[in-house]
Amino acid sequence: RDLMSQSRTREILTKTTVDHMAIIKKYTSGRQEKNPALRMKWMMAMKYPITADKRIMEMIPERNEQGQTLWSKTNDAGSDRVMVSPLAVTWWNRNGPTTSTVHYPKVYKTYFEKVERLKHGTFGPVHFRNQVKIRRRVDINPGHADLSAKEAQDVIMEVVFPNEVGARILTSESQLTITKEKKEELQDCKIAPLMVAYMLERELVRKTRFLPVAGGTSSVYIEVLHLTQGTCWEQMYTPGGEVRNDDVDQSLIIAARNIVRRATVSADPLASLLEMCHSTQIGGIRMVDILRQNPTEEQAVDICKAAMGLRISSSFSFGGFTFKRTSGSSVKKEEEVLTGNLQTLKIRVHEGYEEFTMVGRRATAILRKATRRLIQLIVSGRDEQSIAEAIIVAMVFSQEDCMIKAVRGDLNFVNRANQRLNPMHQLLRHFQKDAKVLFQNWGIEPIDNVMGMVGILPDMTPSTEMSLRGVRVSKMGVDEYSSTERVIVSIDRFLRVRDQRGNVLLSPEEVSETQGTEKLTITYSSSMMWEINGPESVLVNTYQWIIRNWETVKIQWSQDPTMLYNKMEFEPFQSLVPKAARGQYSGFVRTLFQQMRDVLGTFDTVQIIKLLPFAAAPPEQSRMQFSSLTVNVRGSGMRILVRGNSPVFNYNKATKRLTVLGKDAGALTEDPDEGTAGVESAVLRGFLILGKEDKRYGPALSINELINLAKGEKANVLIGQGDVVLVMKRKRDSS
């Protein structure tokens, strides 16, 4: 009526033809609804907008309690279905058959967990301020495992469609565990298999998106991104729970940093790094398995991946910033330059015009440079400090002469292994400590008024008139490099990672020194990591290792002591022994051991275990005798008595257990009683004692009759106070 009362609309409604073919085609071709909202409106205005299977007539009454009709006897035109009222849905929801809900929380696990996190999360106040968002690749799917798409597909097929044809290879540990777990959970599950498959995919695969983010990037923050940051506002939020995938990422970074730092100071960094990666577990899963599946990009993690022969991102790292070249090219030439202190540095100069994006945790920038010249640097960051960090890194990276001339004093920074850093890192460390001279000498220039950009003065204050030459501060962040492309890299024994053109992408100098506490338990089985928990842990672990491996240690002690002394498991222990005493202690203990080997019946298991770690240092020949040996633990020197117990090393004869600094270090399986009872493991020169008497080898010989044995031949021999033991003549002569 309304429309007909207005002349213009009446004209349209009465005169306009609707038989225009194009229009009819537009709204009728294809199965896709062209105007869903409108369709919904006029459908719901009808009495029976829904169609249902004929069986519904047996399952639902014709009228509800209020007497309203629930279905019509008319068939749906063009199909064998009944027309049904929306009220029927209400009736069904209230009175329809119920089904077991036990599987819902299991199948829709990710949703149920999300609800819990939001329920227990805390939303703080809303602040209005400019948001510097930068696009980063983020994990949008909390609570997932880290399977590859293919691995997940095999697991899903095996769980949801176990009888389908097709080869499925479940190889990795995580695949097998998940499959077993899910099959048990989903027994007799009535939820549509396709739905279950979709939900499993959410649980198994990491989904990433390239999204603008200003705050936290872990998946529990990303799931509420739309609630926590807009264009000009942010809302504080603390998640109401953590998810394993974020914990894995965080713990992986900590483990990788610890391992790289430790490997740097060992004799063969690369071999040590690999040994540690292979023997470390994070939250009960092997670190190498996590590295293969986890896409986290962080300097230490990438060094570990490179060592394992995995591909990594082609961007490179300098001063804690990720650099990605976006255009231009350069060749590298060695050049000698003089610092302000007239020290000569050999630097690899990049000749040519290049543009880079620089992305750090708290600042980002665009850098344009020519040979040893910064042309333009546009920085944005969270605060003055972060912006200054980015400017320093870019100035050093530019290799400009005024930067090198700004050096005051000598450059002699060393890494953890006491090796001098390369010149570029020398310069970086120097200016990171104090950049005053650098900023003062850089030069300033007047600036034009450009929207969203301000200048920055040498004292790091903003200005609209002047700015450091070539440097501007922007309100907008620079997006992270979005590509997930991975390249083949090589790594040398000093853990420098290069791409195939030989450019250094990463080196241990780039690994952050930040210490954190891991969310998941990291178990380092490698002896190289014993010291991470301090000297006490080194002491306990060393003795635990000897006791665990006592059977082999015992044989080596008598046959091949040099090989035993050189075992890497004794390396950490040396740091506990006062430097001046190491050689003397070692000489003393080795002499003592040799006497034990030579003189029958003086073999004393406990004493060997106690003194063995001291014999690992290069020995000094001296006539020094010691009644106690000092180790530095608990901030002071503590004594280990050569004969007898002490708080550091205490063996309880009754329980046969050893405690080191009050911590249990294990039990000795054989009877290490002093004197004759220990004679079974005593060592005869030229013979190996195998154990108790074995009648198969004939009657006991006296010690003098042994001379007639051939090499490798076994015999029973009578020694000491009537003890009979089985011995074998050594295959090679060595005392």
Swiss-Prot record:
It comes from the Viruses. One of its GO terms (molecular function) is RNA binding. Keywords: Cap snatching, Eukaryotic host gene expression shutoff by virus, Eukaryotic host transcription shutoff by virus, Host gene expression shutoff by virus, Host mitochondrion, Host nucleus, Host-virus interaction, Inhibition of host innate immune response by virus, Inhibition of host MAVS by virus, Inhibition of host RLR pathway by virus, Inhibition of host RNA polymerase II by virus, mRNA capping, mRNA processing, Viral immunoevasion, Viral transcription, Virion. GO terms for biological process: 7-methylguanosine mRNA capping; cap snatching; DNA-templated transcription; symbiont-mediated suppression of host cytoplasmic pattern recognition receptor signaling pathway via inhibition of MAVS activity; symbiont-mediated suppression of host gene expression; symbiont-mediated suppression of host mRNA transcription via inhibition of RNA polymerase II activity. One of its GO terms (cellular component) is host cell nucleus. The keyword Thylakoid does not apply. InterPro entries: Flu_PB2_2nd, Flu_PB2_6th, Flu_PB2_C, Flu_PB2_CAP-bd, Flu_PB2_middle, Flu_PB2_N, PB2_helical, PDB2_C. Influenza RNA polymerase is composed of three subunits: PB1, PB2 and PA. Interacts (via N-terminus) with PB1 (via C-terminus). Interacts with nucleoprotein NP (via N-terminus). Interacts (via N-terminus) with host MAVS (via N-terminus); this interaction inhibits host innate immune response. This is Polymerase basic protein 2. It comes from Influenza A virus (strain A/Silky Chicken/Hong Kong/SF189/2001 H5N1 genotype A). The lineage of its organism: Viruses, Riboviria, Orthornavirae, Negarnaviricota, Polyploviricotina.
